[in-house]
Amino acid sequence: MDKFRVQGPTRLQGEVTISGAKNAALPILFAALLAEEPVEIQNVPKLKDIDTTMKLLTQLGTKVERNGSVWIDASNVNNFSAPYDLVKTMRASIWALGPLVARFGQGQVSLPGGCAIGARPVDLHIFGLEKLGAEIKLEEGYVKASVNGRLKGAHIVMDKVSVGATVTIMSAATLAEGTTIIENAAREPEIVDTANFLVALGAKISGQGTDRITIEGVERLGGGVYRVLPDRIETGTFLVAAAISGGKIVCRNAQPDTLDAVLAKLREAGADIETGEDWISLDMHGKRPKAVTVRTAPHPAFPTDMQAQFTLLNLVAEGTGVITETIFENRFMHVPELIRMGAHAEIESNTVICHGVEKLSGAQVMATDLRASASLVLAGCIAEGTTVVDRIYHIDRGYERIEDKLRALGANIERVKGE
């Protein structure tokens, strides 16, 4: 397995170009199964999960090409089963189910894998598809969906806010007969982006970005060209990298209005922040950040995917900060690793109390999930001495060329190839 070796401490400064959002590109790639004509998707990041998705789409009979953009032609889909060997590494595969049953009347997906951070049941996806008239069976480790004729529009009230299930229901409902209303829908920018992609293909969707999305079913979706929005979590990660190292950064190809909660907390921590239409700059003027209190919650509140990075910020800040995680259980696996580097923290159920220290020391640490592993790499950039981060395949699932981008900001980081 590959590792990162990071030599610190360094002040990170310079410019970074933000990649397309993984969490929008994935649902958009799966939603392309609904289109009867070719689709061009621009600004798709080069990531392990994207490669897996492209393989999965190919296995379903879709023509997939990548040359700058990703080109998808789903006009000849002839296999309606997403097998375990591809699904096991990536839970996003469940997003194949809605489009398959909506367009072809049948689909089956092996129960998914992915990061091990708490319960992420597929129940809400199943609940939504059943409301639209699909018959669902769980057999031999597969979720199997079928319908005679077309799905039927429905008024669906979600028990809890779920990004994944909102995507499934919204994409399936585009080809359903009649109108579907999703109440308590997720409001994330990536949901809006997926909806806008579907609209570009001819879907009739309104209310995306609010908690009530309305979809008027159409008979078919055509082709089109669409550009994936910038990755707000990658943007936030690099802003934190500059903030914890006293540095100065400009993030290009960013979308500031998707990061309001994060920018507010960075300002509270003492950062000078300016924004333009597609850029964000942060300047710490060489100062240590001040500790902040953070509570994760569904968008537009503070994102759970930025929690690990802000835990690190608090651990090297002036003062004591409290971080409360309300979205996933079991999402403080980075904290014991940071304690090995000299951090002072206590975990109490879903809260971590961070007592800022002036410096961290390099150590051998292990990545446990995608965002936690990014925080360990950033910790290595500011710690004294050498840090080795093991199991970085987690990082490769969500960050495009993170070591190249950090190196351009002055980090001393190298990838050590595993056996």
Curated annotation (Swiss-Prot):
Protein origin, superkingdom: Bacteria
EC number in record: 2.5.1.7
Record flagged with keyword Cell wall biogenesis/degradation: yes
Pathway: Cell wall biogenesis; peptidoglycan biosynthesis
First-tier enzyme category under EC: transferase
Pfam family, one: EPSP_synthase
Disulfide bond sites: none
Modified residues (2-(S-cysteinyl)pyruvic acid O-phosphothioketal): C115
Active site per UniProt: C115 (proton donor)
Binding site for UDP-N-acetyl-alpha-D-glucosamine: R91, R120, P121, V122, D123, L124, K160, V161, S162, V163, D305, I327
Binding-site residues for phosphoenolpyruvate, renumbered to this chain: K22, N23
Reaction equation(s) it catalyzes: phosphoenolpyruvate + UDP-N-acetyl-alpha-D-glucosamine = UDP-N-acetyl-3-O-(1-carboxyvinyl)-alpha-D-glucosamine + phosphate
Regulation: In vitro inhibited by covalent binding of fosfomycin and the fungal product terreic acid in the presence of substrate UDP-N-acetylglucosamine, with an inactivation rate constant of 130 M(-1)sec(-1) for terreic acid.
Subcellular localization(s) per the UniProt record: Cytoplasm
Gene Ontology BP terms: cell division; cell wall organization; peptidoglycan biosynthetic process; regulation of cell shape; UDP-N-acetylgalactosamine biosynthetic process
Keywords attached to this entry: Cell cycle, Cell division, Cell shape, Cell wall biogenesis/degradation, Cytoplasm, Peptidoglycan synthesis, Pyruvate, Transferase
Record PANTHER family: UDP-N-ACETYLGLUCOSAMINE 1-CARBOXYVINYLTRANSFERASE
Known role: Cell wall formation. Adds enolpyruvyl to UDP-N-acetylglucosamine. Target for the antibiotic fosfomycin.
Family: Belongs to the EPSP synthase family. MurA subfamily.
NCBIfam families membership: murA, PRK09369.1
Name of the protein in its database record: UDP-N-acetylglucosamine 1-carboxyvinyltransferase
Encoding gene per record: murA
